[in-house]
Design a protein with these regions (language model features):
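Bacterial N-terminal signal peptides that target proteins for export
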Residues: 2-9
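C-terminal motif of bacterial Sec signal peptides marking the signal peptidase cleavage site
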Residues: 18-21
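Bacterial signal peptide processing site
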Residues: 23-26
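N-terminal Sec/ER secretory leader and immediately downstream segment
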Residues: 32-147
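Alpha-helical rod/repeat scaffolding segments in eukaryotic adaptors/tethers
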Residues: 87-94, 110-120, 124, 145, ...
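Secondary-structure edge/capping motif, primarily at the C-terminal ends of alpha-helices
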Residues: 108-115, 134, 138, 173-177, ...
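Extended amphipathic alpha-helical interaction segments
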Residues: 154-238
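A cross-kingdom marker for long, charged
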Residues: 227-293
Length: 293
């Protein structure tokens, strides 16, 4: 079995841009600036993974791509969209703990980027709690991250610095400790939660915005399914997750509006009908319920 390079995007970086609601130009510039400055480091980090397909190479989206998507979506904070913290106690399997670590990390970023620091502190603590179950506890124990976070509540620049520090530590720790499969699974959890938040926020308000969001995210979904399919230990839960995401992608590709675009489709220009938006959105919400319950 050959090893192929898995160029895995720093997970917090993805989370920030997959759910962030950029409510002001200054906030957008701050986050984009931090991401651009870390670009050189991204290029030097890669994670290898044992793959079933020797020609497979998983390339997640760049931070700029994700930021562009969210600028168009302009999602605002809504109460009750994040995963309940109490749910952390019901996740007993390694798979559930790993994928919901991604969900909670996504919720953390959603709260931080919307200045909901009290809620963010709670999600940081639950992420730390769950990290102990999946082999990432040392990341949250180092540098007194929780204490630093609490001391800097209200200062988004400092909070963002802490999150970017976590992202780099996570990437290095996974690489150094051979925890590669974890990254693909919690990346999938973060993606599902980001889509859940985006769908809830936009659905019924602006079909054009959600059309663009869904269309661009389908490209990411295809990469995720390839990443999940490349994991060597194909458990039933993992296969079910992969199949479910593939069902969403297939349903999207079979929409009338998508088929009308033909082979040279430009996903940015796809305008879905309202009933098509509802169809895909309901599948995403069902998928999110499946992984969090």
């Amino acid at each position: 079995m050959k090893k192929r390079s898995l160029h895995f995007l720093y997970f917090i970086c993805f989370l920030v841009f997959s759910v962030v609601s950029c409510n002001s130009e200054n906030k957008e510039e701050t986050i984009l600036s931090k991401t651009e400055n870390s670009g050189d480091e991204d290029a030097t980090h890669s994670i290898e993974i044992d793959t079933i397909d020797p020609d497979f190479e998983f390339m997640p989206p760049s931070p700029i791509q994700i930021a562009s998507i969210l600028k168009k979506a302009n999602m605002s904070y809504e109460e009750g969209l994040t995963n309940k913290i109490s749910n952390a106690d019901i996740y007993s399997t390694k798979f559930k703990q790993t994928i919901n670590f991604g969900v909670y990390a996504c919720d953390l970023a959603y709260c931080v980027t919307n200045d909901k620091y009290e809620e963010a502190g709670k999600y940081l603590k639950v992420a730390k709690k769950m990290s102990a179950n999946i082999g990432l506890e040392s990341i949250f124990q180092s540098d007194h991250l929780v204490e630093r976070f609490e001391k800097n509540i209200g200062n988004q620049d400092s909070i963002m610095d802490i999150l970017f520090h976590v992202q780099m530590m996570t990437d290095d720790y996974i690489h150094d400790n051979d925890l590669r499969d974890l990254s693909v699974i919690y990346f999938a959890g973060a993606w599902v939660e980001g889509m859940n938040i985006g769908t809830h926020t936009i659905l019924g308000n602006d079909d054009h915005k959600i059309s663009v969001l869904l269309s661009e995210q389908m490209t990411i979904a295809r990469s995720i399914t390839k990443g999940l399919g490349a994991v060597k230990n194909q458990t039933d839960d993992l296969v079910d997750l992969t199949d479910h995401i593939e069902e969403v992608v297939d349903a999207y590709n079979n929409l009338w509006s998508v088929k009308q675009e033909g082979e040279n489709i430009d996903y940015l220009d796809v305008e879905l009908k309202h009933e098509e938006v509802v169809t895909i959105s309901e599948m995403i919400l069902e998928l999110r319920e499946e992984i969090t319950m």
